[in-house]
Each structure stands twice: as C-alpha cells, then as structure tokens.
Amino acid sequence: QGYSSAASDVYKRQILEAAGKAGIPIPHLCYLKEINEIAACRMCMVEIEDMERLAPACNTEVKEGMAVHTNTPRVRQARKTNLRLILSQHNSNCTVCIRSGNCELQKLSHDLNIHFQPYPVKPERSKINLDTPIVREASKCVKCMRCVQVCDKIQGMNIWDVAGTGSRTTVDIKNGRTLKDTDCTFCGQCVTHCPTGALTVRDDTIRVLRALADPEKITVVQVAPAVRVAWAEFMEIPTKLATTGRMVAALKTMGFDYVFDLSLIHI
C-alpha cells in the first residue's frame, strides 16, 4: 500500500511533516517543528529509493518524484536498534516514574515491540536536586535536546546546554551551575516538552499531607486566578461545576485552615 502526493501539497516540507499530513505515522522522539529538527534520536529513519543510506524524516526535505518507504523491514530494524541504544543509557524503572503511562519513550518501546535489551544498560548517575520546582533526573535523559531548544528559541532564557563529548554527551545547566543559581523563571516549558521523566515538576504532596496532619501547624492556601480555571481540567469535571466555592469547600474539607484568592488581595 502506498500514497502519492502532488509536489505542491508538500513543497518545502520535511518528510515527517508531509507523511503526517497524509495520515502516515512516522515515529519520532526529538522532533519539534521548526524548533528541534536535528535528528538526534534517529527514530524517524526512512528508506528513499535510489539512496543507499536511510534518511531522517524530520530534516529531509521532500523533492518532486521522491519515493519514500516508511515501514520496510530495514527501516523497522534500524528503528529498533536505535531505540535499544537509547534504552541502554536510560533508567527504565518505569513503575516508579511519574511519567509512566504518559511517556513518549515508553510508547515507542511498546509500538516497536521492544521486549528484550541485548545491550548493557548503563544509565547516567547523578544526584537529584529538590531545591527548585523543576526536578531533573539525568538517568532518564535521552539527549533529545528539546529542553535546550525550547528554552533558547521560545523562552529566550538559555538555561540548558550540551555538556561532555562523544558517548558522554549529556544535557546540563549551562556553565555547570545549579538551577536555583540561574535566571530560570520556572515556566515549565522544558518539562512540558520533555519526552520522558528526565524533567518533572517537584511533587510536594507528602509535605502537604504531613503539614495537614500536624495540629501545631496552620495551613494556608493561596489560589491564583489560573488555578480557579485549571482545576476543573485536572479533576476532569465540567467547567460549570468547578465553582470557586466548590474548590474552597474541598480545600477546607481536606483540613486547610485558610484559603485566600490572590486576585482579591490588595497591597
């Protein structure tokens, strides 16, 4: 089964984008349109007629008369090999990972039927720092460079950078600093675009529950305007039912002593 398209429909498009428009899925891990098209993961490899080597679909432009095969045995084997190499440097302890069930790497492993790992697994080891709202686990980083590009090209903050060389290449905070020593605004764009659990938002649930259980502590909630809107989506309830009164009642039922609305506070 094949698909043909007029050159005008896909002119100046990358193969990955053109295939997506035609309803043909091509797996990818590092690609972000016009932001990160560096073919770092090599998961989007395709076979092009009259070309000896496989080509990355994310940064190979469509040309008139080009015949592209996206699901040949050679292509599938290359993708499996590349994914296994990525997994050989990845902490695959998925059962305790916050991204389990919502992880692009995990989904790719299922889609490509990866059931065994022939390569030695040696994930990077580093201390997990919980001093800031954004937490990085280096052992789960797949070097896709999404965080680097999003922070540079969209946010303009240049917090993340590439460190090391060769097989020791990794992503780290620029100039070897800690995150709290940078100008990071903790906007969360790097977390949103990370395909794995390498970058996550710090979970303070246990600390909150301990505070609620401590009779000597007075607990206060400050609600920002955005929270009043977003909590309905998080709780999967209709917006019309997610009233401010209902949210406050829920927080008081949990045991919080005071609930303040930041939009009503005048300084």
Regions found by a protein language model. Name each.
Residues Q1-A7, Y11, I265-H266:
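Single conserved hydrophobic/aromatic residue that forms the stacking wall/gate
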